[in-house]
Amino acid sequence: MKALHFGAGNIGRGFIGKLLADAGIQLTFADVNQVVLDALNARHSYQVHVVGENEQVDTVSGVNAVSSIGDDVVDLIAHVDLITTAVGPVVLERIAPAIAKGLVKRKAQGVDAPLNIIACENMVRGTTQLKGHVMNALADGDKAWVEQHVGFVDSAVDRIVPPSASATNDPLEVTVETFSEWIVDKTQFKGALPNIPGMELTDNLMAFVERKLFTLNTGHAITAYLGKLAGHQTIRDAILDESIRAVVKGAMEESGAVLIKRYGFDADKHAAYIQKILGRFENPYLKDDVERVGRQPLRKLSAGDRLIKPLLGTLEYGLPHVNLVKGIAAAMHFRSDEDPQAQELAALITEKGPQAALAQISGLDANSDVVAEAVNAYNATK
């Protein structure tokens, strides 16, 4: 089996690329970073530091790399069996034209073997969004062939891969936590379902997408925002602060009540899942910076993301949300010289006041009780 993976960054190398290579799949990375491409093609291998209670160093070998903006990547798309991505949500649109060209070439060469594409991004139904961009780049005459032969498979991914300062200045070395989860929608594949260790197949993907978004992402963000306010440097420092931990755990329990109501998750198993995530935040080997985790607060405060979406669920089912509201208030306080969205957020609050600013960012009704609760919490944490 041959696979092409867009994005040779830390998540690409440390998570998805590693799983594919470990499964014996012939893997080629596509990226724009020439230093990384040259290193991969010189060595065809790299090291992954898996950190947790039992630290280990794994070597990923037998890999190649091509530029994601040249003809080589188009040629590869015409022949591979699987395409995966870990490029970040905003970059999906940029790689779509190359994928479209490759699919046209595949059709022209008479390659009718099924191809599956899986976007492994921190977003809801990212592959469906990528499909839209690819279809926009195709001529009408090619769309029916693509619909018939190409599966666009949505997935949920979960592994903390912080930027790590390599002691050896090796551009390929990467550090990851022990935990990883890659869940894919088995109803969207074309052809036979792949058997890749570490890839879980489900016919109920949205339950797992929201479980991860409402628990890991919600908890991670609130830990970062409260941690920043309290002067902590890392996620570990923040979650070991009992006052922060109580709010984070409470928020995950509130969002969890929504999941249990919506999808029928087992309450005891979900409580154990929350405990596991709190343990991941405590990992002493991950130097996970609160500023990194908190960045892009406008996106994280938008209607479909990790703070407002679970809050909307609590409103839908008439459930408590006091800790989620505290997290939202802390997000509104996020300031960072490195992050344009943090600066935009600050300017918006200065210009419009917290009530109108939150309503604009989140889509919540400015006159609703929950916005008033958030504004009160915001003012209380000044």
From Swiss-Prot:
NAD(+) binds at residues 3-14. One of its GO terms (cellular component) is cytosol. GO terms for biological process: mannitol catabolic process. It comes from the Bacteria. Its EC number is 1.1.1.17. One of its GO terms (molecular function) is mannitol-1-phosphate 5-dehydrogenase activity. The keyword Oxidoreductase applies. Keywords: NAD, Oxidoreductase. It catalyses: D-mannitol 1-phosphate + NAD(+) = beta-D-fructose 6-phosphate + NADH + H(+). It is an enzyme of class 1 (oxidoreductase). The keyword Iron-sulfur does not apply. Belongs to the mannitol dehydrogenase family. This is Mannitol-1-phosphate 5-dehydrogenase. It comes from Salmonella typhimurium (strain LT2 / SGSC1412 / ATCC 700720). The gene is mtlD.
